[in-house]
Amino acid sequence: MDARFERYVENLRTVRTLSQPKFSPDMKAKELLETIQSNAIKCFDYMKENNAILNELVFQRAPAELTSAEIASLQEFADKMFNYASSEDCGIAYKVYSLLLENARIRGDKPAIVRYLYGKAVSLHYLNVRGRDYAINPYGTQVRGLFQEGAGYIAEYESFDKTTKGYIMRCLGNSRMSMPRSTPEECTEYMKVFDKAMGIITDPYYRQLDPDLPWGKFEYAMHMDRETLLSYLRRYNDPVVAAKVMESAEAIYRDRVLYKGEEARLQNWRVSYLYKAACFHAGRCTAREVVEELLDIIHHTDIQDYSDTGINKNLTAVSYLVAYEVKMPPADRREMACRTEEVMDRSLRYLNNVPQNQYSRVVSRAVRELVEMQAEAGTARRSLLNYILVAHKPTYVHSMMVAGLTRMFVKQMLKKSPELFVGVMGCKTVEEVRRSRIEICELAYECGLYHDVGKSYVFMYIGNNYRRLLDEEFTCIQWHTVFGYELLCNVGGKDDLAPAALYHHTFYDGHGGYPKNYPPCPADIKPIVDALTVADSLDAATDNIGRCYTMAKPVDTLLGEFHAQRGTRYAPEVVALLDDEDFCRDLKETLDETRKSVYLEVYHVKR
């Protein structure tokens, strides 16, 4: 592999270490801030070096001009970057596989085409961001198209070597990957693709032809994927799908002991739960038995186990428990109420005790699932959102800063133009606005605090400080507004917090920003969203402590940009506040002193 690729990997790992510093509680405040700032500057320098490496060796390369040695080096680099859920850099693996695929097409090298179709498809799948049941799935169609093209080479199967045959079968098995599965119609299409692929994978002809291929692993992985239909079955009584899910659950449960050690990617803690849940939907057991199984999993897990498996058993298992508790008869629910409440309290104690310097993003995902399941059960708790924010410290710092700045802008707007807030929080007159100004300011703070909660779905991109974002990654990041909206709707924020999350990147005049194709921001929250939009840009652009993907801008420079985009991107009423010298002075002091305080609070160091 080219030594420059080795340098890229070294830089990547160094930046990841610098981006996730661990501080002792007794560290001096000045030392902590200086360390974060120094790390950010170092990360920026590493990023520039990595961008130069990628431009030279990947982004600016013509596929037709690659030599055999360069192809081998690129393939080794891509394989090093991609390792499914444990990938070093999934996005760059995708770009390299794309380059290699174009080269293979030019050369007419069919084995290489199949190999790189699989590589490009599977890396794009892991790069892609997906909502619940794949309802949000920006690159799903592309992923399926690539896998289906690779699977199409089954027509020439006998002519290929064993390695290529393995990739054809992987493409075939994954051809159902990224398919939506939230409605009966979508499940029907999913099952058609699944059954076709499984029919070939279990066909004795192919197994006898190549007995050394890992047929059991292919089959096991497909059965695991079909278990995702349990989410569908919790909403629909579908005996046909339930029978298929039961079939997969039995296969997984039967083969669970076969995949350990290096094969653990195919095995996880959920197997016994999946079996019980499938039994319930197939009419073979009660909801109480599913809940009992989950309680057993939770109670046999160390409450101080903060490994990924420990987090899933202590938290994700609770979300599944919530989902099946509501399906129990009232008498069973009353009888088990103490035990289920005890588990909920236990999960909150667990969250409170997670070492903050080791806070895993797995925690964030587990809490999201818990919120979603509680929403289905009608018991969602808004307080859980704070645990999502804590999972990524830079986002937590930014959210706290934006919360304070939004409240500051709204407070000033209430003084100068209270009429703008008629309609907010049900206020029908200016006098009602004045009487509700404290509550409006607190709502503004909450909107700012949770505006980026949807980024918990895309932490893998916003934590990328070792190279520039790819266009595909930026597209995924843009969905954080919609994810945030859905998450906040689940906790009762549909009329205030959720719209703030959805619209904070939409231009004031409606002709720019994202997301696209949504109705205008509701008038009864728009004044707060307008203030939030300015506050968001202000903090992101001026953070001179931890920001490392670009250099911070001077406040005066940014004020000029606000004025230049007044009436288009930013609300005139908010930008007008920046003409007040006293307010601007207070704003600059807030940006400086408050930012330091927030960093110290988030990293748990006292001033």
Question: Where are the regions a protein language model picked out?
Answer:
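Amphipathic alpha-helical repeat scaffolds of TPR domains
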Residues: 6-41, 62-83, 110-131, 159-182, ...
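Intrinsically disordered, glycine/charged-rich C-terminal tails and inter-domain linkers
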Residues: 8-39, 335, 339-346, 350-354, ...
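Helix-turn-helix repeat elements of alpha-solenoid scaffolds
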Residues: 29-56, 82-102, 132-154, 182-207, ...
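Flexible helix-coil transition and linker loops at the boundaries of alpha-helical arrays
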Residues: 56-67, 100-114, 147-165, 198-217, ...
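Histidine/acidic-rich helix-loop-helix segments that form or flank divalent-metal centers
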Residues: 160-163, 210-215, 422-448, 488-534, ...
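Extended, non-transmembrane interaction/recognition domains
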Residues: 280-283, 299-314, 322-352, 385
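Acidic/His-rich, divalent-metal-binding segments that scaffold phosphate/diphosphate chemistry
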Residues: 329-478
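An active-site-proximal "capping" alpha-helix that borders the catalytic cofactor pocket
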Residues: 400-410, 476-489, 554-571
